[in-house]
């Protein structure tokens, strides 16, 4: 992460362009490292969720390892075609995240989120960029609950949520780390 990086930029590249490329390369390198170090715990969760037939939890577990393609396949195999389409776009466009957040807000305002499986809401909330918590309505106000997004995750996977889904990919790695520290 802190090793010198040969950016292979032309000599006349501006300092701003140099800094932009350097930040992107460092974030990509950090992301790759994080994917590798969380792979074993992700696979342990995957095996447990498959054994218990918890398909939506399986999708979430795969996303916590940034295994987006496998998560989309798992959603598709579970019969969640629409969810698979959204999962395939995980961590991407801010417009997609905003659309998913709008849907969550609508469900919450109408109180129907109380009838949606919490594992499913957790996946939708993550896709919307919520990496700390998500609110769920209750039939009565006292029944309202909060879903802790990083519940059951070690610090590396929790940090990964911020890197991959909580901050725009274009933002510097430092923004993801600050977001994680603030949580």
Predicted regions and their residues:
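Long all-alpha helical scaffold domains
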Residues: 19-20, 24, 28-183
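Intrinsically disordered, low-complexity acidic/proline-rich regions
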Residues: 1-30
């Amino acid at each position: 992460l802190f090793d010198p990086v040969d950016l292979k930029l032309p000599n006349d590249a501006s300092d701003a362009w140099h800094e932009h490329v350097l930040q992107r390369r460092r974030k990509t390198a950090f992301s790759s490292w994080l994917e590798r170090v969380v792979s074993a715990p992700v696979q342990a969760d995957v095996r447990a969720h498959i054994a218990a037939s918890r398909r939506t939890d399986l999708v979430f577990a795969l996303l916590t390892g940034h295994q987006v393609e496998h998560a989309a396949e798992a959603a598709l195999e579970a019969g969640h075609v629409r969810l698979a389409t959204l999962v395939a776009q995980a961590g991407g466009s801010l417009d997609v995240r905003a659309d998913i957040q709008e849907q969550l807000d609508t469900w919450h305002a109408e109180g129907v989120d109380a009838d949606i499986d919490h594992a499913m809401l957790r996946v939708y909330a993550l896709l919307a960029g919520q990496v700390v918590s998500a609110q769920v309505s209750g039939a009565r106000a006292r029944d309202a609950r909060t879903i802790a997004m990083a519940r059951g995750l070690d610090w590396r996977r929790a940090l990964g949520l911020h890197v991959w889904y909580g901050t725009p990919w274009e933002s510097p790695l430092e923004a993801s780390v600050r977001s994680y520290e603030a949580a």
